[in-house]
């Protein structure tokens, strides 16, 4: 799970959508046919401690090659999250 937080909701959503576009392109260019993603969508608890939260859920057997090429500065990366709430 990739999660982005920001005090401005439009900025948070925009950054999440930009990364989703990059992920889509990278999955195709790396030939990762078994990897897909859900999102970006707001987290279940959309706002926490004054910051809006958006997430992208990656699903696949080995997302490491994909993650290595992504611009993840400011993102929280959670491997095998115990829940998605």
Describe each region flagged by the PLM:
Residues 1-85:
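Accessory helical-bundle/CTD segments and flexible terminal tails appended to RecA-like ATPase motors
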């Amino acid at each position: 799970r990739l999660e982005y937080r920001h005090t401005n909701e439009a900025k948070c959503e925009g950054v999440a959508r930009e990364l989703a576009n990059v992920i889509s392109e990278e999955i195709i260019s790396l030939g990762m046919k078994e990897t897909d993603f859900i999102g970006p969508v707001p987290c279940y608890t959309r706002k926490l401690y004054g910051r809006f939260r958006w997430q992208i859920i990656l699903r696949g057997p080995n997302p490491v090659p994909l993650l290595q090429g992504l611009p993840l500065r400011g993102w929280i990366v959670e491997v095998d999250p115990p829940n998605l709430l």
